[in-house]
């Protein structure tokens, strides 16, 4: 997490759209009174949240809180009531493919890698909607972030460890040259050394003009690396603030940080 600004956001950082510094741009992702149901089961209930350009926002909360449902809804995979806008336009009116073309890239919890394909082939697939002339540049950036991937570039994805596969999934998402990178549970079950590698990648990613939305069960990781955090419970946001604000919240301390 950058610490250049008052709330941990570099005030001079520009979004990829080039509209100006973070904090003065149009909100990149906004949900208003957002509700999603699976049959008769409500997964999101009147959720309101906003993601500003150039920041890391994390959604935390227990299993079933609605974190992944929001990520899937924002990416155009689910029908919804209320509103969720990407750069001021309703997601439902944009569509999944167009969202990717406009720079919303979703790295799912399942990773969705092709196990029989090499690291390099998986990475190249991430750039399939981009011009060929950016492929080499993006590949070099990913290998600089995650040297382990370059060392294993000819290795099949299925033979890699879970942590290495997570790096590959993030790397493939970055190959799409995102404006908004959605990382769904990127640290789940990973060893500390892999967590460190992923965390150290955040600032270089932000410097590329990328905004990051994390869903996290690892509350400590979110508090260490996010600029703003929303605590979701039962499909709605019950707390929102900076890491410092939430560390001082008695409910957060007692319920999620062991008192």
Predicted regions and their residues:
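The feature captures the beta-strand-to-loop junction immediately N-terminal to the Walker
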Residues: 60-62
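Helix-to-loop junction immediately C-terminal to a conserved catalytic motif
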Residues: 75
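ABC-type ATPase nucleotide-binding domains, specifically the catalytic core motifs of the NBD
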Residues: 39, 79, 119-137, 145-147, ...
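Catalytic Walker B motif of ABC-type/P-loop ATPase nucleotide-binding domains
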Residues: 181-185
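Conserved ABC transporter NBD signature motif
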Residues: 82-91, 102, 135-139
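ABC ATPase C-loop
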Residues: 173-174
């Amino acid at each position: 997490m950058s610490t250049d600004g008052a709330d941990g956001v570099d005030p001079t950082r520009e979004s990829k759209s080039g509209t100006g510094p973070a904090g003065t741009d149009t909100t990149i992702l906004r949900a208003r009174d957002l509700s999603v149901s699976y049959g008769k089961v409500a997964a999101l209930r009147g959720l309101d949240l906003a993601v500003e350009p150039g920041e890391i926002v994390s959604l935390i909360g227990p299993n079933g809180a609605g974190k992944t449902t929001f990520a899937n809804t924002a990416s155009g995979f689910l029908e919804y009531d209320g509103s969720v806008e990407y750069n001021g336009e309703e997601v439902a009116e944009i569509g999944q493919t167009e969202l990717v073309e406009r720079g919303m890239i979703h790295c799912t919890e399942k990773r969705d890698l092709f196990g029989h394909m090499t690291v390099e082939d998986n990475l190249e697939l991430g750039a399939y909607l981009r011009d060929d002339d950016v492929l080499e540049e993006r590949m070099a950036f990913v290998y600089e972030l995650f040297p382990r991937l370059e060392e294993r570039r000819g290795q099949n994805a299925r033979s890699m460890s879970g942590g290495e596969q997570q790096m590959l999934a993030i790397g493939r998402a970055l190959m799409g040259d995102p404006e908004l990178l959605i990382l769904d549970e990127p640290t789940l079950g990973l060893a500390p050394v892999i967590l460190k590698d992923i965390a150290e990648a955040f600032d270089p990613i932000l410097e590329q003009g990328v905004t990051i939305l994390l869903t996290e069960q690892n509350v400590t990781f979110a508090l260490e690396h996010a600029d703003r955090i929303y605590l979701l419970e039962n499909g709605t946001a019950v707390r929102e603030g900076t890491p410092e604000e939430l560390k001082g919240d008695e409910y957060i301390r007692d319920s999620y940080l062991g008192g």
